[in-house]
């Protein structure tokens, strides 16, 4: 009985820490592909897309192989929207990449992220409860989370981003 109660308490705490639409986005600092510290706070006043990615994920591969992700990244860049690709895979685990591999993947895929951020400890992934890839978050100029979920939840990714980012 004690284990059941403790389990329920733990689950309620886990649920309480997840980010909800309308919440302030948790602030973080991560190293990018060039080993420079990037802070979410430095983009206050700009719209930001967070893309949790794993180059070995079949869903990520599909979006990059078809050019869908690159087209969205380019479109967002043209609108001065910051795109942060985040890799939360631990060293020795599937999906882990080094700084050099991040640069190589970006070039090979002709991708347009503003930065590739390496979160090998998974701390930022846990802050946002990002568990799948590609898991997307849209943050407005005030630092509020306006969307979270799959890139293709609405079927038309362009509409998804133009709708959510125009708020």
Predicted regions and their residues:
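Sec-dependent N-terminal signal peptides
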Residues: 4-13
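Cleaved targeting-peptide boundary
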Residues: 17-25
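A short beta-strand-turn-helix
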Residues: 28-48
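Short active-site neighborhood of thiol/selenol oxidoreductases, capturing the structured segment around
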Residues: 41-61
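Loop/turn elements at helix/coil->beta-strand transitions in domains of secreted/extracellular proteins
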Residues: 45-48, 78-83, 111-114, 141
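Structural microenvironment flanking redox-active thiols in thiol-disulfide oxidoreductases
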Residues: 61-109, 120-125
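Short, internal strand/loop/helix patches
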Residues: 103-140, 145-146
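Thiol-/selenol-based redox modules, centered on thioredoxin-like
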Residues: 140-167
């Amino acid at each position: 009985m004690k284990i059941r109660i403790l389990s329920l308490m733990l689950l309620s705490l886990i649920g309480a820490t997840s980010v909800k639409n309308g919440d302030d986005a948790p602030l973080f600092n991560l190293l990018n592909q060039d080993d420079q510290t990037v802070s979410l706070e430095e983009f206050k006043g700009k719209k930001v897309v967070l893309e949790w990615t794993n180059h070995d994920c079949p869903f990520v591969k599909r979006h990059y192989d078809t050019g869908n992700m690159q087209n969205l990244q380019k479109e967002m860049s043209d609108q001065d929207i910051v795109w942060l690709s985040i890799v939360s895979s631990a060293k020795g685990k599937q999906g882990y990449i080094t700084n050099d591999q991040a640069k190589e993947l970006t070039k090979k895929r002709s991708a347009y992220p503003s930065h590739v951020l390496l979160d090998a400890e998974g701390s930022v992934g846990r802050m946002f409860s990002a568990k799948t890839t590609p898991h997307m978050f849209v943050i407005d100029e005030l630092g509020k989370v306006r969307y979270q979920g799959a890139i293709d939840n609405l079927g038309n990714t362009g509409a998804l981003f133009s709708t959510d980012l125009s708020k």
